[in-house]
Curated annotation (Swiss-Prot):
Keywords attached to this entry: 4Fe-4S, Chlorophyll, Chloroplast, Chromophore, Electron transport, Iron, Iron-sulfur, Magnesium, Membrane, Metal-binding, Oxidoreductase, Photosynthesis, Photosystem I, Plastid, Thylakoid, Transmembrane, Transmembrane helix, Transport
Cell location: Plastid, Chloroplast thylakoid membrane
Main subcellular location of this protein, as a coarse class: plastid
Matches recorded under HAMAP family: PSI_PsaB
Gene Ontology cellular-component terms listed: chloroplast thylakoid membrane; photosystem I
Database matches in SUPFAM superfamilies: Photosystem I subunits PsaA/PsaB
Protein name: Photosystem I P700 chlorophyll a apoprotein A2
Gene name as annotated: psaB
A single MF term (Gene Ontology): chlorophyll binding
Organism per entry: Angiopteris evecta
E.C. code: 1.97.1.12
Length: 734
């Protein structure tokens, strides 16, 4: 008999039911559980798959460049970035009638097109690309790179090129290479691109391969660098009336510290950005030479960790045993990497709008909204993944003997205190925030809005003031002309920064009031509750009072049979599953807040947010309902407009979201009966009964149905909000 899918599991491939297919798909990437898997092969498979991942990323970005070059309007957009709408790609749809063709023909195109809300036009323009030829060249280069990575992935699975286990376990070498090579040298290379290509282009000087070696990025060349007079590179920066892309008002400085924004593009000064990347490069290249490898000099991470013992002895053995625990657990490493990446992704969301790096992106409101929302959702999924792999570490990789009385063991010993504190914080935040909102709702309903409880966020306003925001009247640090911080930065970056932070047309340190205070605490409630769920799941993953032997059951189990009927819903997987709902819920509040605050800022009616955000009906009526009107009118009996695709996506998103509940609020027996009825009918229907299946159809397991339900809930939720966000923003601002 031919071996059936899945080839990696003898047991599953012999399963006579459809469970074989579902469980095969579910465990395809759980390499550890595959037949004949050794630790070395596990590392090699994961290593090779990284090349595949990189190939896919480069293929995707190559496709972005190619389609814009082929079907976009990059050159026309570059002539007038504020008024031409950037085209992502053409739409070919045989269903389009004449009204649809007309509605979607925009941005100077000859047929229906999609508008780009990703910010790639602004990015490419800022880094010095100007023509379609530039885009094609970039696409071709990335395509070649993609092929190269596929070959490298294949190569590293060949016997002669497979790295051994000791190579993967060599943490110091990997850290040195990643710090110096990945971060350091690539930052240096990027500085080089900015200085040699992007900055000259922003000043109207076209540098390409033909004149790269002859065009001086700075009039004095390398002279100041070699003679140690580095400050020369900061002199004569672009003036405040510089027209981006032209020599009008341009300077010659290449590494500056001006602070604030370029007045015309509303983005950070390109010369400040180059300086930043150079500094990062220097720091990381040095950092990548700190760890001990073949030469017997430098730090040993293991020695550093072993030395980290808290003084006084009351806090246990600190970091003893951590090196081997982390170095031998891929789940621990992945958990750490995902936690760091999740935080960074959320920081990217926060910084992309408040300190825009790309020319003219701040005036493209829909793109700003889309990028913020996109990065916050990505951050949410990455963070839940971090907690999931942390829990898997405790179940599969944690060794109590190796970690006696160190920080990990003490976390587990203190789990009651940790979980109960998180629970208390969530309850406190939830009841108080909801109490304030509901009180304010009732006061408005009774016609006495002056009786609302409105709390000024004085601490947050004070923090904004320390950074130089003068509005609140706090005389402190950067908002006080007498402070040493103020005088120290006066000749450098401070004037530009103060100008930016006190300018009401950008998003830097937005003015905050009672509505912000409330929604801030609502978000804090969401964050603490979301955190408490997977933290409890991970800390209880090895065992709890209710189920001391839980780790024997693995990461995901539905229940432990009728004998212990109270053991349903307590696997670490269930904690992950529940936390994703709360994560989506929290990010919903975050993005609602960001979007509404910005819509009123961009429309010049901030009073609407200030007055309506202090009670729930304000959010429902003046944000959600008011802004979904264009969406619901995407098409109606009188025809359609260019928002109709978002209207359809809005409806479709709701449908997918609702289907999620079909899997979430429904039990296995019902499905098993239904499937058997359908199979019976199928086998007795002429023509249909010519198609038979080898596997006996069985319903999804409880855990699988939850996964399918969760996937539909998440996808539907995101589709619905994406359509709302893009339609409501682009409908207002074009």
């Amino acid at each position: 008999m031919a071996s059936r899918f899945p080839k990696f599991s003898q047991g599953l491939s012999q399963d006579p039911t459809t469970r074989r297919i579902w469980f095969g798909i579910a465990t395809a990437h759980d390499f550890e559980s595959h037949d004949d898997m050794t630790e070395e092969r596990l590392y090699q498979k994961i290593f090779a798959s990284h090349f595949g991942q990189l190939a896919v990323i480069f293929l995707w970005t190559s496709g972005n460049l190619f389609h814009v070059a082929w079907q976009g309007n990059f050159e026309a957009w570059g002539q007038d970035p504020l008024h031409v709408r950037p085209i992502a790609h053409a739409i070919w749809d045989p269903h389009f009638g004449q009204p649809a063709v007309e509605a979607y023909t925009r941005g100077g195109a000859s047929g229906p097109v999609n508008i780009a809300y990703s910010g790639v036009y602004q990015w490419w323009y800022t880094i010095g690309l100007r023509t379609n030829q530039d885009l094609y060249t970039g696409a071709l280069f990335l395509l070649a790179l993609s092929a190269l990575f596929l070959i490298a992935g294949w190569l590293h699975l060949q016997p002669k090129w497979k790295p051994g286990l000791s190579w993967f376990k060599n943490a110091e070498s990997r850290l040195n290479h990643h710090l110096s090579g990945l971060f350091g040298v690539s930052s240096l290379a990027w500085t080089g691109h900015l200085v040699h290509v992007a900055i000259p282009e922003s000043r109207g000087e076209h540098v390409r391969w033909d004149n790269l070696l002859t065009a001086l990025p700075h009039p004095q060349g390398l002279g100041p660098f070699l003679s140690g007079q580095w400050s020369v590179y900061a002199q004569n920066p672009d003036s405040t009336n510089h027209l981006f892309g032209t020599s009008q008002g341009a300077g010659t400085g290449i590494l500056t510290f001006l602070g604030g924004f370029h007045p015309q593009t509303q983005s950070l000064w390109l010369t400040d950005i180059a300086h930043h990347h150079l500094a990062i490069a220097v720091v990381f290249i040095i950092a990548g030479h700190m760890y001990r490898t073949n030469f017997g000099i430098g730090h040993s991470i293991k020695e550093i960790l072993e030395a980290h013992t808290p003084p006084g002895g009351r806090l246990g053995r600190g970091h003893k045993g951590l090196y081997d625990t982390i170095n031998n657990s891929l789940h621990f490493q992945l958990g750490l990497a995902l936690a760091a990446l999740g935080v960074i992704t959320s920081l990217v969301a926060q910084h992309m709008y408040s300190l825009p790096a790309y020319a003219f992106i701040a005036q493209d409101f829909t793109t700003q909204a889309a990028l913020y929302t996109h990065h916050q959702y990505i951050a949410g999924f990455i963070m839940t993944g971090a907690f999931a792999h942390g829990a898997i570490f405790f179940i599969r990789d944690y060794n109590p003997e190796q970690n006696r009385d160190n920080v990990l063991a003490r976390m587990l010993e203190h789990k009651e205190a940790i979980i109960s504190h998180l629970s208390w914080a969530s309850l406190f935040l939830g009841f108080h925030t909801l109490g304030l909102y509901v009180h304010n709702d009732v006061m408005l309903a009774f016609g006495t809005p002056e009786k609302q409880i409105l709390i000024e966020p004085v601490f947050a306003q004070w923090i904004q003031s320390t950074h130089g925001k003068a509005l609140y009247g706090f005389d402190v640090l950067l908002s006080s002309a007498d402070s040493p911080a103020f005088t120290a930065g006066q000749s450098l970056w401070l004037p530009g920064w103060l100008d930016a932070i006190n300018n009401n047309s950008n998003s830097l340190f937005l003015t905050i009031g009672p509505g912000d205070f409330l929604v801030h605490h609502a978000i804090a409630l969401g964050l603490h509750t979301t955190t408490s769920i997977p933290v409890k799941g991970a800390l209880d993953a090895r065992g709890s009072k209710l189920m001391p032997d839980k780790k024997e059951f693995g990461y995901s189990f539905p229940c432990d049979g009728p004998g212990r009927g109270g053991t349903c819903d307590i696997s670490a997987w269930d904690a992950f599953y529940l936390s994703v709902f709360w994560m989506l819920n929290t990010i919903g509040w975050v993005t609602f807040y960001w979007h509404w605050k910005h819509i009123t800022l961009w429309q010049g009616n901030v009073a609407q947010f200030d007055e309506s955000s202090t009670y729930l009906m304000g959010w429902l009526r003046d944000y959600l309902w008011l802004n979904s009107s264009q969406l619901i009118n995407g098409y109606n009996p009188f025809g359609m407009n260019s928002l109709s695709v978002w209207a359809w996506m809005f409806l479709f998103g709701h449908l997918v979201w609702a289907i999620g509940f079909m899997f979430l609020i429904s039990w296995r027996g019902y499905w098993q009966e239904l499937i058997e009825t359908l199979a019976w009918a199928h086998e007795r229907t002429p023509l249909a009964n010519l198609v038979r299946w080898k596997d006996k159809p069985v319903a999804l397991s409880i855990v699988q149905a939850r996964l399918v339900g969760l996937a539909h809930f998440s996808v539907g939720y995101i589709f619905t909000y994406a359509a709302f966000l893009i339609a409501s923003t682009s409908g207002k601002f074009g």
